[in-house]
């Protein structure tokens, strides 16, 4: 098995079954499985798969985001509101970063950027004059995933 395939499989197994609170802990678990890797490689992989940290009894743990096939986004998005300068999306805890990444990729031409916390996303459109349209486009985009 190629190293990247083995690494992907092991990382998914660690996050889905055991969990880990730090990248160093993930490296240690990989090492115990005979897979040598660096913290920077783990960091890049976590970013690539949009891993999120979920609060729990033992502290925050890395987790894979729900797949679009497994869970519709409409259950993760609670509200989309805007004023004259900002769009605010409230999400389920731990999903804001993943959803913000989807929005960043889809709406790069119409937004300046997103800022995601644990359960809230702030979106700044390029122009205030199109904020209502941008908010509606984002809402329609997110609904596509929930049908």
UniProtKB/Swiss-Prot annotation:
It is found in: Cytoplasm. Pathway: Amino-acid biosynthesis; L-arginine biosynthesis [regulation]. GO terms for cellular component: cytoplasm. Pfam families: Arg_repressor, Arg_repressor_C. Regulates arginine biosynthesis genes. Belongs to the ArgR family. This is Arginine repressor. It comes from Chlamydia caviae (strain ATCC VR-813 / DSM 19441 / 03DC25 / GPIC).
